[in-house]
A protein has these predicted regions:
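Sequence termini and other peripheral, non-core segments
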Residues: 10, 150, 374-375
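Right-handed parallel beta-helix
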Residues: 35, 40, 60-71, 91-107, ...
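Solvent-exposed adhesion/ligand-recognition segments of exported proteins
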Residues: 14-16
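Acidic glycine-/aspartate-rich tracts in secreted/extracellular proteins
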Residues: 18-21, 42-45, 235-238, 265-267
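C-terminal functional modules
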Residues: 258, 265-267, 271-375
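Aromatic sugar-binding interfaces of carbohydrate-active proteins
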Residues: 194-303
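Extracellular beta-strand-rich solenoid/capping regions of secreted or surface-exposed proteins
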Residues: 3-10, 22-39, 46-65, 71-92
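Glycine-rich beta-solenoid repeat tracts in large extracellular/virion proteins
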Residues: 27-31, 49-58, 76-78, 85-91, ...
Length: 375
């Protein structure tokens, strides 16, 4: 019924009268019809958890809240070719993904993607034909599987923002135990990353990269990033010389960075930037953000860790065992990057529960309960 509701046409709100685990059986849900709200908060306990698949958004005007998406390797052999995102946008626009939980993807846990050069010959045309106006807020993005079934081998990845994506806001998320792409921004991206908590990144923390071989004869575009009020804490899997931000490849970067404390597990401050390139890309430091969202105020970094721990993830009023464990590992400085969901207990097993949805109890404009209860 979830798949049918998302494939329907016209403005619609998906509410849930049954809570439990939905096995996608390696068939991703592809949303191609716009004006969709998925209100996972309406489900009775234990909420909605998707396993063995993910969601691909290929449309516009979509809101997704309070889902847990845990694809897993599903027993596939290393490099077998089972490559699945938790949730990805592909050429989508006007999308909000808020207070969801993603883990155990074999590709990215959460990403915004699409074609690089569709629509014409100019950068503005390219930007209008890939993902844009995307907000990822207050999610838990954890335990991307490392040496699992992705054909390339190691692929524990948090978030990818693909080339030429614009008006992207990544705010208030918890990244934990992801080897790389604790936000990777590809060439020409315009994005704001604010107030995220990143724990135990492995080989890459934040990362900007324009790969010349992927751009061919197209003129390189300057990336524009605003990185404000993020907190990074190294952990058991973090390499000893990891910098906060790596700039890689050939493209130049306009960077506004402010109030981003980043420390290794032993208390050493991380180097702010590192460059990996055979052509030294230029990092131009800005005194103000070039693309700050209207009305948005970043919190000071001193408030971020407590706020993210309290707010991030699906149904924080009734977290599942996976999210409780992740948060405990963040608190205690423990845990590690994993290769298979079986290393941490495997797919969740939950009793199914049902409860009728009473429309009169809900404000349909905000999808919150009128009595103030969380669900």
């Amino acid at each position: 019924s979830l798949r049918v509701a998302q494939e329907a046409e016209g403005p619609r709100i998906v509410v849930c009268e049954v809570g439990g685990v939905i096995d996608l059986n390696r068939r991703d849900i592809r949303v191609t019809n716009p004006f969709l709200t998925i209100a996972g908060q309406t489900a009775p306990e234990p909420g909605i958890t998707l396993i063995r698949g993910g969601i691909s958004l290929r449309t516009h005007d979509v809101i997704v809240r309070h889902l847990r998406i845990r694809p897993g390797a599903d027993g596939a052999a290393p490099k077998w070719g089972w490559e699945v995102d938790g949730l990805t946008t592909s050429g989508a626009h006007d999308v909000i993904v808020d207070q969801c939980s993603f883990s155990w993807a074999t590709d990215e846990n959460l990403s915004a993607s699409g074609p690089r050069f569709d629509g014409g010959d100019t950068a503005e045309q390219w930007r209008q034909h890939t993902s844009r106006r995307i907000t990822f807020s207050r999610n838990i993005v954890s335990e991307g599987l490392s040496n699992a079934s992705h054909a390339k081998g190691e692929h524990s990845k948090g978030t990818l923002i693909h080339d030429n994506a614009t008006q992207v806001l990544i705010v208030g998320n918890l990244y934990a135990h992801d080897h790389e792409r604790n936000q990777l921004f590809k060439g020409g991206v315009h994005a704001v990353s604010a107030n995220n908590l990143i724990y135990n990144p492995g080989n890459r923390c934040m990362h900007y990269a324009l790969n010349a071989s992927e751009w061919g004869a197209h003129p390189w575009q300057v990336g524009q990033l605003s990185i404000v009020g993020n907190v990074v804490r190294g952990g058991p899997s973090t390499r000893a010389d990891l910098p906060f931000l790596i700039v890689e490849g050939q493209g130049d970067l306009d960077l506004y960075a402010l109030d981003n404390p980043a420390r290794h597990a032993d208390g050493r401050a991380m180097q702010e930037t590192g460059i990996i390139s055979d052509r030294e890309p230029k990092i131009r430091r800005l005194n103000a953000s070039p693309h700050w969202p209207a009305g948005f105020r970043a919190r000071p970094s001193s408030e971020v860790e407590a706020w993210v721990k309290a707010e991030a993830g699906a149904r924080p009023w009734a977290r599942d065992a996976v999210d409780r464990r992740i948060l405990q590992e963040v608190r205690t400085g423990t845990g590690r990057i994993i290769d298979d969901e079986a290393e941490v207990g495997g797919y969740p097993v939950m009793d199914e529960a049902s409860r009728p949805f009473v429309e009169a109890d809900w404000d349909l404009a905000t999808m919150t309960r009128k009595d103030g209860a969380p669900s």
